[in-house]
Amino acid sequence: MQASRRTKRDSIPNLYAKCQLSGNCLPDVKNKVEADTLADRLLRWLGSVIYLGGLGIGTGRGSGGSSGYNPLGAPSRVTPSGTVIRPTVPVEGLGPSEIIPVDVVNPGSSSVVPLEDLTVPEVTIDSGEVGGGGLHPSEIDVVTSSDPISDVTGTSSHPTIISGEDNAIAVLDVSPTEPPTKRIALGTRGATSTPHISVISGTTEFGQSSDLNVFVNATFSGDSIGYTEEIPLEELNTIQQFEIETPPKTSTPRETIGRALERARDLYNRRVQQIATRNPAMLGQPSRAIVFGFENPAFDADITQVFERDLEQVAAAPDADFADIVRIGRPRFSQTDTGQIRISRLGRRGTIKTRSGLQIGQAVHFYYDLSTIDTADAIELSTLGQHSGEQSIVDAMIESSFVDPFETPDPTYTEEQQLLDPLTEDFSNSHLVLTSSRRGSSFSIPTIPPGLGLRIYVDDVGSDLFVSYPETRVIPAGGLPTEPFTPLEPPFFSEFYSSDFVYRPSLYRKKRKRSDIF
């Protein structure tokens, strides 16, 4: 049986050229072409520490590159390398633009320059007769000649510095300024018609003054000659601004960042159980919440406490949150995000105990947040005691009012007037309504003979029973009766609307007495 022969794959450059388009190159092909093999990485890493240049160490094919290797012993020649630097733009030479002839200086002459008084010559122009017409200034031709040596003035401005590309040549560009202008003043003295022309140079030395008047016109702008220095001005009496620093909330200095990070890493991590307790023993003596027993009042609670109990005397803790606590740390004070003070204690439970006596338990973080103290309302209080400059007058009659109608009667009314009813009763346009109960009631309204005013008096009938015996008078047509009528006696009453009746004793049937003898 003949074994299958292994087919050789294509070259690495051909494989990389084909698989690069699809992006599924083999790792060895890609690393070989891109020089990312393990050897290439080691060379890069070691090359950053030690120098390996000139050794020819690499992962190439060993052909010496595109130019090949030079044979041993062959003369070496220097190959041209680098870039050719082109010359820059030619710059003008340093010096004045025009050649000015200068007087020859005698070495034996004195170096002190004598001072001379400069006087302006007066030019007199004959204007003819006195009565003739005046001479207009525009008709006068004034010609001044300039001296090329004495008219050269310096400038106070800084020259322009031009530097080349290689920063090796510095050229100063000095531009001479134009000579100052001449000013001509024309005036007339007195009543004469002879004008006076004064030619004054534009440059005036310091300390000299001219006899000319100066007119300031805001429509014309001046020319600034020379270098001007701009000095920033500061405002006077400006409003000062300051920041109010927040006062500290505690008297102790602020803890460092390292201690804060250590505390956060110690109390607030995933291996520490967080328990919020409201037991007041957490603030003073936490042992009251862990074990039952006598507490020493002189005991300092600001230390770490360790609790050891025998298995025979195991009892439940007074607080269920502090069960199986074998160690509790000292109190730590911090501040919450809401501004409250938090008291924290780090404890450890003894849940599991091995035969060797090792206790294993979870770390517990007990914290107690103190309640906030609300700000007191601002109540304006009165000052106690007497002070100079202050006086208070108290009058009980003004502050209080006493009501007693008997002691302080009204002087406008007498006793009789107070008993009278000041209200006037008016019964005009009124109706008389008579009401009665279930039983029949008789009302007697007396009649008054005609001719007299009709006056009807209605008694105020309440819940009581009133019995009335009316009298009837028959007035004959002739006048009043002479003898009064006498009512019948005794009167006889009959009730027609009675709800019951009563038999008289004489109407009852008499029963005969029967004897049992027969």
Curated annotation (Swiss-Prot):
Position of sequence motif Nuclear localization signal: 1-10, 509-515
Localisation per UniProt entry: Virion; Host nucleus; Host early endosome; Host Golgi apparatus
Presence of keyword Nucleotidyltransferase: no
Pfam families: Late_protein_L2
GO biological process: microtubule-dependent intracellular transport of viral material towards nucleus; symbiont entry into host cell; viral penetration into host nucleus
Disulfide bridge positions per record: C19-C25
Protein name in the entry: Minor capsid protein L2
Taxonomic lineage from the root: Viruses, Monodnaviria, Shotokuvirae, Cossaviricota, Papovaviricetes
Encoding gene, per UniProt annotation: L2
